[in-house]
A protein has these predicted regions:
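Short proline/glycine-enriched turn/loop motifs at strand-loop junctions of beta-rich domains
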Residues: 23-28, 133-136, 154, 197
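Trp- and acidic/polar-enriched beta-sheet ligand-binding modules for extracellular glycan
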Residues: 120-123, 148-197
């Protein structure tokens, strides 16, 4: 894979996202905007306390270098969740590791940005354990499609819940209606709602 000029990393701790930008190439100046606000020259980790859009870009010798990178950070109940029973994902598209499915960071339109987790020849499956028993009434997930690169939406999304970790009950089922023939690069957010449990 080609080197990306910018890599975005985010850690969530004590109610805050700690965001770090890394240069993929030497001698770059990195800039960012939060929620399309003022442009800031990046010099160190910055802190965000709520859901936000982050746009970053690189400059080298006063000229734009590579494509800009745009991601979304989402605050949600599962940010500190433990992940188990995660099926093996592609090493090429690991999304940042096991916690990529709950880290609150959604990738952009470039599937090579390092923030999408991909599966080949196997279904995605994982058990997400929250740090305490909590009431939930929905699960939101985002999926990416770019048919020219053989990246497709799931055929079906199922959500099960459990209070004790042993007995699971199906709460929601969704079958996305997006055709595999639909052209272009895009992602869709799916909201699966169910009676509060």
């Amino acid at each position: 894979l080609e080197t990306q000029p910018i890599d975005i990393n985010s850690e969530y701790e004590d109610g805050h996202f700690y965001v770090t930008l890394n240069k993929g190439v030497k001698d770059l100046k990195l800039f960012y905007q939060i929620n399309q606000d003022e442009t800031v020259l990046y010099d160190s980790t910055f802190i965000i306390s709520e859901s936000a859009n982050i746009k970053t870009w690189a400059i080298k010798n006063d000229v734009s270098y590579g494509d800009s990178l745009e991601i979304e950070l989402y605050e949600h109940k599962g940010l500190d969740a433990r992940i188990a029973n995660l099926k093996v994902y592609s090493k090429t598209y690991d999304g940042g590791g096991d916690d990529a499915i709950v880290n609150g960071l959604r990738g952009g339109l470039n599937f090579r940005d390092g923030h999408w987790q991909g599966y080949f020849g196997t279904d995605f499956e994982a058990t997400i354990t929250l740090d305490s028993i909590q009431r939930i009434d929905s699960v939101i997930s985002s999926f990416y499609q770019y048919n020219l690169s053989w990246i497709f939406m799931p055929k079906q999304i199922l959500v099960y819940t459990s209070v004790d970790g042993d007995n699971y009950y199906k709460r929601a089922k969704l079958s996305p209606s997006i055709s595999v023939k639909q052209e272009g690069q895009f992602f869709e957010e799916f909201v699966l709602t169910f009676p509060e449990v």
